[in-house]
Amino acid sequence: MMTRWPSPAKLNLFLYITGQRADGYHTLQTLFQFLDYGDTLTIEPRTDGQLRLLTPVAGVPDEENLIVRAARLLMHAASESDRLPAGSGADISIDKRLPMGGGLGGGSSNAATVLVALNHLWGCGLSEDELATLGLQLGADVPVFVRGHAAFAEGVGEILTPVEPEEKWYLVAHPGVSIPTPIIFRDPELPRNTPRRSINTLLNCEFSNDCELIARKRFREVDAALSWLLEYAPSRLTGTGACVFAEFNTESAARQVLDTAPAWLNGFVARGVNLSPLKQALL
């Protein structure tokens, strides 16, 4: 039976870098909220134990693709604990709408959707905590997508506290460049000592992103996109970029601005949601 699963985008409504660990990873404080917009995974369970990605990504070997890695990781973990039914396999394809290197969490979201969906379809019975622990092996952002609730994140992004930020409308714009996360995190000018603050303090401050100035300085397309958006509404970088977003109180206000976007700027309008579309699909 063919099944379709949402793989939603996320926004970092704020992002502050509070330090750098001895292993090179940065510690941070960030606020994750999901969008009712993203990729869609189509999964058809198999009974012969085969795992096939029907929509490979050019230049990325299947075994390095996060979708395949997530499926194999679940297979291994469930098998190790005798919770993988014999013959469990799947054909997986993706309808990709989220840009790579956009700061919307596309790859992490894909991995989380695979973990959650295959755990359900195969009947493995792993708990949400177990799936989140597996997800952390694939990327720091994967656990928040597994848990599916808007969250305040600390540590390297894996210490999550559920929160309920206002569900606004967003115009998300992609300036046509891809920004690999390491480019931003390795920049010597990146702030690395923003003081840690409580959730309540941060939620009542003006939101900002410590990566934004670096992204604007190094990528003129990001600078141009933000300069344009800021004429209309409060706007920020999400994650390490390249996408930027502006917040609105209504869908119509966001669409009105999108309709005036310059030809070089791609964008979409979406609602911020505190319960992810993936989580809603399981209810």
UniProtKB/Swiss-Prot annotation:
Catalyses which reaction(s): 4-CDP-2-C-methyl-D-erythritol + ATP = 4-CDP-2-C-methyl-D-erythritol 2-phosphate + ADP + H(+)
EC number: 2.7.1.148
Catalytic residue positions: 10, 141
GO molecular function: 4-(cytidine 5'-diphospho)-2-C-methyl-D-erythritol kinase activity; ATP binding
InterPro entries, alphabetized: GHMP_kinase_C_dom (IPR013750), GHMP_kinase_C_sf (IPR036554), GHMP_kinase_N_dom (IPR006204), IspE (IPR004424), Ribosomal_Su5_D2-typ_SF (IPR020568), Ribsml_uS5_D2-typ_fold_subgr (IPR014721)
Protein's pathway: Isoprenoid biosynthesis; isopentenyl diphosphate biosynthesis via DXP pathway; isopentenyl diphosphate from 1-deoxy-D-xylulose 5-phosphate: step 3/6
Transmembrane region(s): none
Signal sequence range: none
GO biological process: isopentenyl diphosphate biosynthetic process, methylerythritol 4-phosphate pathway; terpenoid biosynthetic process
Enzyme class, first EC level, given as a word: transferase
Residues that bind ATP: 99-109
Similarity comment text for this entry: Belongs to the GHMP kinase family. IspE subfamily.
Entries under PANTHER family matching the protein: 4-DIPHOSPHOCYTIDYL-2-C-METHYL-D-ERYTHRITOL KINASE, CHLOROPLASTIC (PTHR43527:SF2)
Subunit structure: Homodimer.
Function: Catalyzes the phosphorylation of the position 2 hydroxy group of 4-diphosphocytidyl-2C-methyl-D-erythritol.
The protein, known as: 4-diphosphocytidyl-2-C-methyl-D-erythritol kinase
Organism: Klebsiella pneumoniae subsp. pneumoniae (strain ATCC 700721 / MGH 78578)
